[in-house]
């Protein structure tokens, strides 16, 4: 690229670090602004589908990721009361054969650590809390909590559902989804019957569900359980939940679920919020990504995956067009990502119970393979190929205008 824009990334979560790793590989000048003073083991498990794993492999992180992840053999939907198997979608080798990349489950902190090792440490600014951004003709002014100000050619909001950068584009507010999720981590040795074979298990009830899967290379089992809630409380990853309240909410469920809940020392509670899709993520010098752009409910397990796709797309566009046409880069990124993430957001609101709708009993193996192939719109998406194709088309259009 000719000319390297100074890209300021606000937020060093999965979205921000993924973009920083992309920009580092592309040689794009950037910095990362994170309000925390240090990175810590926050959050629970996360599912990484082939559409995101493919991107992470492209960043050269295949070995590091495999070392900390687990590789579930299948996604099982089971009955809440008697643990009867309702449906099964193969993952493992079948998923890799179909989509060219594995399906992983990983602790969020482990994924974050892998990404943190892939970024330029000199570009990382901790204790840097951005409180406002002001776009001007020639740059963007960033205002910090300590009263200082800085300027950047491009600012990317990777700062989550309460994004400061998003507030410069729209006045909308997060929407409470009417429930909460309680998350926990349990040593695999405490629940050997769930750890013996690596699986994603989802127990579906009428108004709640519980899902669990291995993380930390199989040493831990991560679980999340939904609970109804009439009003919003905390949205923090670090809010402590109530073990007794959770156990009461799942009283009468099968022994696998109640035993898993009882085995957790501490649980965290996170109230569910999202936002309606918006058509505009960018201006001349601002862009949104991840939860700042498209916060979604966790029921499709694609929030982090879509943030990683965002990172590849935005990184490729900035690397290609540079300072000569930042606006072109941001518009192209927006055009590629808004329709896809809006579709994922909409599907995420349906909830996991839909996975059990084909039947109440498990069908033949072919049914599972069909379910795996039905996920092609998600797992089969190649963000790198989509970005390359769009960049070629944009270059052709620009060349025609110049001629």
Model features per residue range: what roles?
Residues 176-177, 195-199, 255-271:
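A short coil-to-beta-strand element that immediately follows conserved catalytic motifs
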Residues 2-5, 67, 259, 300-301, ...:
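C-terminal helical "tail/cap" subdomain of flavin- and related membrane-associated enzymes
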Residues 8, 12-37, 156-157, 182, ...:
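Conserved mid-domain beta->alpha element of the FAD-binding
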Residues 198-232, 243, 250, 272:
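Active-site substrate-recognition segment that forms the wall
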Residues 124, 138-140, 204, 267-276:
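Short gly/ser/thr-rich secondary-structure transition/capping motifs
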Residues 34-37, 91-98, 228-233, 348-351, ...:
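Short glycine/proline- and charge-enriched loop/turn segments
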Residues 2-7, 49-187, 230-247, 381-403:
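Conserved N-terminal helical subregion
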Residues 38-54:
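Conserved N-terminal glycine-rich FAD pyrophosphate-binding loop of Rossmann-like flavoproteins
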């Amino acid at each position: 690229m000719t000319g390297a824009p100074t890209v300021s990334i606000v937020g060093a979560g999965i979205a921000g670090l993924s973009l920083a790793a992309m920009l580092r590989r592309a040689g794009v000048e950037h910095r990362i602004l994170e309000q925390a003073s240090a990175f810590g083991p926050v959050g629970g498990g996360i599912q990484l589908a082939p559409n995101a794993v493919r991107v992470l492999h492209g960043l050269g992180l295949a070995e590091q990721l495999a070392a900390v992840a687990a590789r579930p053999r299948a996604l099982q939907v089971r009955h809440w009361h008697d643990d009867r198997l309702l449906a099964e979608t193969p993952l493992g080798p079948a998923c890799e054969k179909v989509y060219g990349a594995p399906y992983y489950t990983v602790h969020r902190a482990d994924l974050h650590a892998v990404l943190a090792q892939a970024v330029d440490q000199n570009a990382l600014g901790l204790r840097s809390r951005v409180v406002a951004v002001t776009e001007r003709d020639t740059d963007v002014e960033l205002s910090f909590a300590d009263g200082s100000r800085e300027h950047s050619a491009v600012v990317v909001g990777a700062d989550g559902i309460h994004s400061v950068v998003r507030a410069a584009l729209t006045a909308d507010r997060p929407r409470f989804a009417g429930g909460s999720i309680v998350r926990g981590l349990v040593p695999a040795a405490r629940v050997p019957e769930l750890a013996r074979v690596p699986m994603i298990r989802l127990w579906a009830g009428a108004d709640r569900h519980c899902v669990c899967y291995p993380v930390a290379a199989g040493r831990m089992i991560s679980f999340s359980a939904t609970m109804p809630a009439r009003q919003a409380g905390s949205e923090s990853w670090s809010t402590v939940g109530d073990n007794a309240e959770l156990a009461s909410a799942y009283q009468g469920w099968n022994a696998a679920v109640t035993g898993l809940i009882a085995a957790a020392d501490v649980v965290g509670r996170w109230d569910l919020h999202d936002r309606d899709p918006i058509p505009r993520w960018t201006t001349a010098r601002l862009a949104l990504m991840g939860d700042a752009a498209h916060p979604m409910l966790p029921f499709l397990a694609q929030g982090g995956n879509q943030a990683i796709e965002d990172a590849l797309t935005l990184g490729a566009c900035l690397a290609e067009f540079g300072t000569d046409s930042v606006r072109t880069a941001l518009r192209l990124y927006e055009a590629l990502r808004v329709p896809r993430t809006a579709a994922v957001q909409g599907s995420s609101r349906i909830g996991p119970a839909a996975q059990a709708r084909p039947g109440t009993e498990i069908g033949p193996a072919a049914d599972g393979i069909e379910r795996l192939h039905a996920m092609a719109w998600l797992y089969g998406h190649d963000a790198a190929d989509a970005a390359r194709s769009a960049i070629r088309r944009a270059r052709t259009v620009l060349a025609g205008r110049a001629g």
